Every structure is written in C-alpha cells, then in structure tokens.
C-alpha cells in the first residue's frame, strides 16, 4: 500500500468518526484488521494534527495509549480496536 493510499484511508476513518458513523468506522476496522494493531494506533497518532481539534489531542493520546496497552492482553483485537474508535468517537473532536 502506498503512502498516499494509507493517508487517504486514515482520512476515511477520521471522517467516519467525525460523522459518528459507527457502521462505517467498524467497516474500516474490518478492512484494516490485517495490519498490526500497533501500526493502526501509530497511524492515527501520526495523522492526528491533520484531523483532530487541538484541544482534543491530549485526550486522543491518552485513549490511544490505553488501548495500545490493552492490545497486549486481549483475545479479540478487532473488538478492542472498535472499542478504541468508539471511545474516540465519543470523546474527541474531529475537525471538519
């Protein structure tokens, strides 16, 4: 996957989160679960300044760190990733 494709993919994820579209967000996770979950958390972290309101960045960092830690212990990585995105959806302001 090229860098442009990955960047566009994260834009799709942030759009689904901003729109509070659980179905689209979950579909994104399902389509990307073959990636290492740690790389998804890192990808969101790397793209946050482009997509997240500045006042929400500290909250996003805490959520990502928490779910990345939990990732080491969970049986179902997809469920953990969807839970993370749901918490971001509920607590982080995404730029329009």
Task: Indicate residue ranges for each PLM-predicted region.
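Helix-rich C-terminal "collar"/helical-bundle subdomain used as an assembly and partner-interaction module
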Residues: 12-96
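Conserved alpha/beta core segments of nucleic-acid transaction machinery
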Residues: 1-16
């Amino acid at each position: 996957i090229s860098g442009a494709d990955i960047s566009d993919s994260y834009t799709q994820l942030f759009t689904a989160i901003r729109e509070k579209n659980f179905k689209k967000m979950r579909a994104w996770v399902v389509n990307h679960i073959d990636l290492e979950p740690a790389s998804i958390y890192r990808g969101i972290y790397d793209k946050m300044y482009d997509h997240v309101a500045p006042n929400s960045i500290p909250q996003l960092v805490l959520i990502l760190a928490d779910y990345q830690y939990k990732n080491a212990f969970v049986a179902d990585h997809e469920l953990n990733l969807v839970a993370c995105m749901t918490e971001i959806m509920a607590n982080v302001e995404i730029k329009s």
